């Protein structure tokens, strides 16, 4: 590898010779969202993605005739027909064509329902769950006492923040159509 290394930078030309960069380029070329109208979201930071997903839910629900308003506090994202709604979106994970992971689910926060977006390359599916269903299905321990959906701090301590995985082919049985939890 013939590059000019300095202590403060790698040039745009030099990065092209790094194995890590080559792997990243290949993964980018193989992204299942390439050419999809949803590709733009795949390229966003998590924070920006979350804000855009909230906007999508707001516009979608408004178009369906729901009354969407600002939240009462930072524990939920919107109020839809007076219901406090937390919004969580997931795109298929790189290299795993059927894997969704919704993150930062906190049953102790002030919301009534969670709206889950499952963003496929050609469609967005909207699901919902009550706060109680989230708690009952995520705030659980296995037979060894491990918090199996715990997002932070390992499996031994309940961090209060959970994740949910789905293979994308079988959405969790406790999910309901979004309209059902908003009525």
Please identify what each model-predicted range represents.
Residues 1-81, 88-183:
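Nucleic-acid endonuclease domains
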């Amino acid at each position: 590898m013939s590059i000019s290394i300095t202590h403060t930078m790698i040039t745009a030309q030099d990065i092209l010779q790094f194995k890590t960069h080559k792997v990243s380029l290949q993964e980018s070329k193989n992204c299942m969202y390439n050419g999809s109208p949803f590709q733009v979201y795949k390229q966003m930071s998590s924070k920006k993605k979350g804000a855009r997903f909230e906007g999508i839910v707001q516009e979608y629900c408004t178009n369906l005739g729901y009354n969407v308003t600002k939240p009462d506090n930072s524990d939920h994202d919107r109020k839809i027909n007076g219901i406090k709604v937390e919004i969580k979106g997931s795109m298929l994970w790189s290299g795993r064509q059927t894997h969704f992971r919704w993150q930062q689910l906190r049953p102790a926060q002030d919301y009534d329902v969670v709206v889950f977006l499952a963003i496929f390359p050609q469609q967005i599916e909207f699901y919902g769950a009550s706060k109680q269903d989230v708690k009952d299905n995520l705030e659980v321990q296995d037979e060894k006492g491990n918090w199996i959906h715990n997002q932070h701090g390992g499996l031994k301590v309940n961090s209060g923040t959970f994740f949910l995985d789905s293979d994308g082919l079988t959405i969790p049985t406790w999910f309901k159509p979004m309209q059902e939890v908003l009525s």
